[in-house]
């Protein structure tokens, strides 16, 4: 169940990141805070609160994951959010994200590193010391 909590935390933090990106594209600059009170910005402000709530919920899930998983297995899973956010940002036309070969290689290296860390090697090096 620890991996489930960790993956749910990653999903929430990734959704929060995408939501906050969209919100910041639709709100006035931070220097014009008084404009944020304009009723025309009610929807983006509500989504901003939703994004922040997703971050808080993500932390709660992360705490649950840490109760059940060793840190050396749980912490690398956070890098999945880089992969998820990059992939999802490409699918949102409004973000106008570009995907280059070097970014693809970066995502592939993250995935490869996760496999090396999280999958058991089955060799002597994986047995715990006493």
Curated annotation (Swiss-Prot):
The chain crosses the membrane at residues 5-25, 45-65, 75-95, 104-124. Residues 26-44, 96-103 are periplasmic. It is found in: Cell inner membrane. The keyword Transport applies. GO terms for molecular function: carbohydrate derivative transmembrane transporter activity. It holds the Pfam family EamA. Keywords: Cell inner membrane, Cell membrane, Lipid A biosynthesis, Lipid biosynthesis, Lipid metabolism, Lipopolysaccharide biosynthesis, Membrane, Transmembrane, Transmembrane helix, Transport. It is a multi-pass membrane protein. Pathway: Bacterial outer membrane biogenesis; lipopolysaccharide biosynthesis. Signal peptide: none annotated. GO terms for biological process: lipid A biosynthetic process; lipopolysaccharide biosynthetic process. It comes from the Bacteria. InterPro entries: EamA_dom (IPR000620), Flippase_ArnF (IPR022832), Small_drug/metabolite_transptr (IPR000390). GO terms for cellular component: plasma membrane. NCBIfam families: PRK02971.1-2. Belongs to the ArnF family. Translocates 4-amino-4-deoxy-L-arabinose-phosphoundecaprenol (alpha-L-Ara4N-phosphoundecaprenol) from the cytoplasmic to the periplasmic side of the inner membrane. Heterodimer of ArnE and ArnF. This is Probable 4-amino-4-deoxy-L-arabinose-phosphoundecaprenol flippase subunit ArnF. It comes from Sodalis glossinidius (strain morsitans). The gene is arnF.
